[in-house]
Amino acid sequence: MQKLYAEPPPSSAPVSMASSGGGGPPSGGGGGGGGGGGGGPPPPSNNNPNPTSNGGSMSPLARSAYTMNSMGLPVGGMSSVSPQAAATFSSSVLDSAAAVASMSASMSASMSASMNASMNGSMGAAAMNSMGGNCMTPSSMSYASMGSPLGNMGGCMAMSAASMSAAGLSGTYGAMPPGSREMETGSPNSLGRSRVDKPTTYRRSYTHAKPPYSYISLITMAIQNNPTRMLTLSEIYQFIMDLFPFYRQNQQRWQNSIRHSLSFNDCFVKIPRTPDKPGKGSFWTLHPDSGNMFENGCYLRRQKRFKDEKKEAIRQLHKSPSHSSLEATSPGKKDHEDSHHMHHHHHSRLDHHQHHKEAGGASIAGVNVLSAAHSKDAEALAMLHANAELCLSQQPQHVPTHHHHQHHQLQQEELSAMMANRCHPSLITDYHSSMHPLKQEPSGYTPSSHPFSINRLLPTESKADIKMYDMSQYAGYNALSPLTNSHAALGQDSYYQSLGYHAPAGTTSL
């Protein structure tokens, strides 16, 4: 190995280190004893033939440490990083085994002290270079963690890799203080601590979860756990908060629910305070007849809701008297209505049968005539208008108006009767019976004025045609005089006004 650094002055500090570490012959163990050598070839120490001032031979390990310190690197940091500084802490090294043991112990102490310092690749490379071997590999230079120089050191030193890793790493982990051991994220202790922390946080959140009890169960629990079996409202609140941490928050919400449960359940009875027990608020206790509402003392499930008979009777009395009287008389009233409807239905069937026997042909003929008249309305529209105007011009205004109004009502009744004959009577009676409890019809009610009658469903033009057709029939009974020009003086406005006047008040255009 060629000379890379200048010769040290005689009064240098590493001389004492070299002299203290030289425990063996220069060929095998003198300079390499401090570095844990003795099992391999000696380091090339013949490049330093000049002895120091006190007679000790300066090994390349000590020289490299000196030169690195003289280059401006901090002494404390290099002593903690460089493994050769371990030889300064051992006063007498007898053999290589003792040197390895002392080196591992001092190395672990120095490395635990240098945990706070930042280690980079150049410092690790300098430590490897100071050992005198060709260990400047990219792997050793690239590693910046604490354990990487220890792992690479076994291949560079004289010991075998297996023995060095077994001795050095076990000594390092064994001699590390507890603080540095817990700082490692991958150590078993940190994993165990995280496993211990997780159940504690889960248990903490589990205690703050909502308990699976109803408000009635909580109130019953509080009352039954009291020796006097009586509690005020504030004492019930306090018992629930002491037992379940969940109810220590959002107090206004669940306390309202507690008050509602006390008021609306018959199993809780309010007892006023006596003079011997002064204080604020009444007592709440369980109803003596409520018994054991929960199965086998388990508050998770209630058997059946308790109802006090006296309170239930009071509730029934507080209901509306009209409603209760209607409910009480509704069965007899319903039977009376049913019998009345059955009687009416029987008579309607008899009347219908007799009507078909006597005048069946006439009704059928009337229906046919009506249908034929509807089919011919479009063709005879002009004639109807002429006849209507003739009727209005020949007679006074109020007479045909009154006469036509009476005839229109008669026509509506006939039409409704014909529709009733065509429909099944049971359907009509069922319809009226179903509508009877809901709506009471006025006294002058006729089926023709129903909103769903045929007159309401017909368009406005068809209704006007029917009216004019009826007027033309009545106009035929007058003197059959020819058409005059008097209807021209009447005008179209009076015609539409007469139609609007004749229209019944209930008709609406769809």
UniProtKB/Swiss-Prot annotation:
> Carries keyword Phosphoprotein?
yes
Q: Which Pfam families match?
A: Forkhead, Forkhead_N
Where are the compositionally biased (Basic residues) regions? 341-356
As annotated, the DNA-binding region falls at 209-300
Q: What's the superkingdom here?
A: Eukaryota
SMART domains to which the protein is assigned, alphabetical: FH
- Carrying Phosphoserine, the residues are 187, 190, 320, 322, 330
Q: Which GO terms describe its molecular function?
A: DNA-binding transcription factor activity, RNA polymerase II-specific; protein domain specific binding; RNA polymerase II cis-regulatory region sequence-specific DNA binding; RNA polymerase II transcription regulatory region sequence-specific DNA binding
- Some GO term, biological process aspect, for this entry: which one? autophagic cell death
> Which SUPFAM superfamilies does the UniProt record give?
Winged helix' DNA-binding domain
Q: Does the keyword Transcription apply?
A: yes
Q: What InterPro entries does the entry give? A: FH-like_dFKH, Fork-head_N, Fork_head_dom, FOX_domain-containing, TF_fork_head_CS_1, TF_fork_head_CS_2, WH-like_DNA-bd_sf, WH_DNA-bd_sf
Write out the annotated subcellular location. Nucleus
**Chain segments carrying region Disordered:** 1-62, 175-205, 309-359
Keywords, sorted A to Z: Developmental protein, DNA-binding, Nucleus, Phosphoprotein, Transcription, Transcription regulation
Biased region (Gly residues) positions are 20-39
The entry's function note states: Fkh promotes terminal as opposed to segmental development. In the absence of fkh, this developmental switch does not occur. The nuclear localization of the fkh protein suggest that fkh regulates the transcription of other, subordinate, genes.
Q: From the Swiss-Prot or TrEMBL record, give the protein name.
A: Protein fork head
Q: Which organism is it from?
A: Drosophila melanogaster
